[in-house]
């Protein structure tokens, strides 16, 4: 037996999730391990006909306060925390009549699941585990002497070492690290929830006074934004979205694949109608909606800028049909992401060996988003199409005549789509599709010129335009008017609004003001 291995002679088991408990208890019993257990765990083991010592028999103190106090006792924690490498600790154990544990198996009350179920405050508080984390942390601290297991997924490892002298020191250290991560995640979940409750109760406190989050390494990526940068994907606990997407086909996702897919996924789901968004370098090559079919939406989105769409990322907010898949298969595409795929669509797409096919749940649309800055974190409410000014019914007609219902529908589409464009952003649209996108320029005039240039004379004529922020001068608007747009929607709010509105009236272009802005940096 290696000197750093600790044979398992005595185990303490207290688990809420009983998955795998039967096999574990039977294996421990066959190996001659003494089992001490609590409450329903002890009852489950006893029902298997396996000898088990209830913890109250060990402590001489009954379980009380509706189960809130079971294991918080020196005879339990001394047996966990005793460093058996130290003669003084062994002497004290002998004096106290305490036998040490070599294995602690604990999983915790389902606090996060209780919160997610919509339970009331008191029920959530009742699911905050106290004794469990105390035992886990004690065993993890004392990993030179004790192995700690916090997940049914680790039970096979326990069984495999029972006849080989127990876990090695390195293995116990690894288990301890996993245990500390487990309790840290649990504590962050509790602390975040209770901070949110305080914020909700205090109308003057818009943001919680404390923010915590935990993420787990999902996989290393080939490299980051550039080949000289290392990178990895971490998944957030309790979250769902792109990071948890199922990859149905293709090469491993890259860092840039993820950033573009995230932008595309969000852009597609900004729209309630069937929508396809094609993204490259986090900016739209094309976005389109269609009540005819998702394939029609894809054709229109691709037509906006077919050159830039080469090697792009495609997102659909509806099931991808075989018809759409056949269209996509004709174009080099890095990633396609959708909530589902019609039978046969994946097979069609898979003819392209390298395309990455993802299936994901709809993105989280509420809540807050964060951005790291040097020395801190910026937090803001996620920008959604839900401001009062995003509803055309609340727009102000500032110039020209009211447009028809069809043109207003195009204006609403353009206004929704421009949120996905990096500022300064100008977007031209016609018939539910973008026809020209001007993005990321440091002045609005250049964004307008870029949008018009991308559209070309034929498509720009008769289109409508959206600007993510106000026109500071009339010059940006005049570029659009000269290109032949019929209507434009913009936030307004410039000190030169009168000048811009006057230019619209002179050009015979209808102008709506939203009072809302959608910068994106």
UniProtKB/Swiss-Prot annotation:
Keyword Flavoprotein carried by entry: no
Any single GO BP term: 'de novo' IMP biosynthetic process
Family assignment from sequence similarity: Belongs to the PurH family.
Protein name according to UniProt: Bifunctional purine biosynthesis protein PurH
EC number, UniProt record: 2.1.2.3, 3.5.4.10
Source organism of the structure: Corynebacterium efficiens (strain DSM 44549 / YS-314 / AJ 12310 / JCM 11189 / NBRC 100395)
Domain MGS-like: 1-150
CDD domains listed in its UniProt record: IMPCH (cd01421)
Molecular-function GO terms, alphabetical: IMP cyclohydrolase activity; phosphoribosylaminoimidazolecarboxamide formyltransferase activity
KW Transferase (keyword) present: yes
UniProt keyword list: Hydrolase, Multifunctional enzyme, Purine biosynthesis, Transferase
Gene, per the UniProt record: purH
């Amino acid at each position: 037996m290696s000197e750093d291995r600790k044979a398992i002679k005595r185990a303490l088991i207290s688990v809420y999730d009983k998955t795998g408990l039967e096999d574990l208890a039977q294996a421990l019993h066959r190996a001659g391990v003494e089992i001490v257990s609590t409450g329903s765990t002890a009852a489950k083991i006893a029902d298997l006909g396996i000898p088990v010592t209830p913890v109250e028999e060990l402590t001489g103190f009954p379980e009380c306060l509706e189960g809130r106090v079971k294991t918080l006792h020196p005879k339990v924690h001394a047996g966990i925390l005793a460093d058996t490498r130290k003669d003084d600790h062994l002497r004290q154990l002998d004096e106290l009549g305490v036998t040490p544990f070599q294995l602690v198996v604990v999983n915790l009350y389902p606090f996060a699941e209780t919160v997610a179920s919509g339970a009331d405050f008191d029920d959530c508080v009742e699911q905050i585990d106290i004794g469990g984390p105390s035992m886990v942390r004690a065993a993890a601290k004392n990993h030179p002497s004790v192995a700690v297991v916090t997940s049914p997924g680790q039970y096979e490892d326990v069984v495999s070492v029972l006849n080989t002298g127990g876990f090695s020191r390195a293995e116990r250290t690894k288990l301890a690290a996993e245990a500390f991560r487990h309790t840290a995640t649990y504590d962050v979940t509790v602390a975040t929830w209770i901070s949110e409750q305080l914020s909700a109760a205090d109308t003057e406190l818009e943001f919680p006074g404390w923010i915590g989050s935990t993420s787990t390494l999902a996989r290393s990526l080939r490299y980051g934004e550039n080949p000289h940068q290392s990178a990895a994907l971490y998944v957030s606990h309790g979250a769902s979205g792109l990071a948890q997407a199922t990859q149905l086909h293709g090469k491993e996702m890259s860092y840039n694949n993820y950033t573009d897919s995230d932008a595309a996924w969000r852009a597609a789901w900004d729209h309630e109608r069937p929508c396809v968004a094609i993204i490259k370098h986090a900016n739209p090559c094309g976005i389109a909606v269609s009540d005819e079919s998702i394939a029609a939406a894809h054709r229109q989105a691709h037509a906006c800028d077919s050159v830039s769409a080469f090697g792009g990322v495609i997102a659909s907010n509806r099931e991808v049909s075989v018809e759409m898949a056949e269209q996509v298969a004709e174009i080099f595409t890095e990633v396609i992401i959708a909530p589902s795929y019609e039978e046969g669509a994946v097979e069609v797409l898979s003819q392209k060996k390298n395309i990455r096919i993802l299936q994901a749940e709809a993105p989280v649309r509420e809540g807050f988003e964060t951005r790291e800055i040097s020395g801190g974190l910026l937090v803001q409410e996620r920008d959604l199409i839900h401001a009062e000014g995003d509803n055309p019914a609340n727009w102000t007609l500032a110039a020209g005549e009211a447009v028809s219902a069809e043109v207003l529908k195009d204006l609403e589409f353009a206004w929704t789509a421009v949120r996905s464009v990096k500022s300064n952003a100008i977007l031209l649209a016609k018939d539910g599709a973008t026809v020209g996108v001007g993005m990321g320029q440091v002045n609005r005039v250049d964004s307008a010129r870029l949008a018009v240039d991308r559209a070309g004379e034929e498509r720009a004529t008769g289109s409508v335009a959206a600007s993510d922020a106000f026109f500071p001068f009339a010059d940006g608007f005049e570029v659009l008017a000269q290109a032949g747009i019929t209507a434009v929607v913009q936030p307004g709010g410039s000190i030169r609004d009168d000048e811009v509105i006057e230019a619209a009236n002179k050009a015979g272009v209808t102008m709506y003001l939203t009072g809302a802005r959608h910068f994106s940096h």
